[in-house]
């Protein structure tokens, strides 16, 4: 029988500790795929670019989570299938999500709460949404050598 599985994989983006994944069991997480999303984000700098088009209008005296960390948490949660901000309270201490957001895995160092992420979403202006759209288009065109023959927009307004 052919063994096509690597023994282990290393994810260098997490600077606080060595992060090595193996396939031998032990502590398991249903969100391990986020490690690959984070690795791609590290290469393509998508969340960093998104943070660059948003103005952080929060009072700096009361900030516990940097804008980039909030964006990563929210985007990675959606990428893992947690579409609602209310999932943030359940995921605040998820070790994989914390690593992907460059947060310590210590229990006392939680990710942002649902109200914090909801405030982030509700403070984005129309102008910033437009800039986000432009950025995503630029990113798309940079990754494709030629324009596609057609683009299908699947707009589904149902839940």
Language model features with spans:
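Dynamic "connector" segments at or just before major functional cores
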Residues: 1-159
């Amino acid at each position: 029988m052919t063994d096509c599985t690597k023994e282990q994989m290393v994810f260098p983006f997490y600077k606080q500790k060595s992060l090595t994944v193996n396939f031998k069991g032990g502590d398991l997480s249903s969100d391990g795929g986020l490690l690959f999303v984070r690795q791609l984000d590290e290469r393509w700098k998508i969340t960093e670019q998104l943070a660059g088009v948003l103005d952080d209008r929060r009072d700096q005296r009361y900030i516990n989570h940097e804008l980039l960390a909030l964006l990563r948490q929210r985007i990675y949660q959606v990428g893992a299938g947690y579409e609602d901000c209310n999932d943030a309270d359940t995921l605040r201490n998820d070790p994989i999500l914390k690593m992907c957001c460059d947060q310590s895995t210590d229990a006392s160092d939680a990710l942002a709460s649902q109200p914090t992420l909801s405030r982030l979403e509700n403070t984005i202006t129309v102008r910033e949404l437009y800039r986000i759209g432009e950025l995503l288009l630029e990113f798309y065109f940079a990754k494709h050598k030629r324009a596609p023959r057609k683009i299908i927009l699947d707009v589904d307004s149902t839940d």
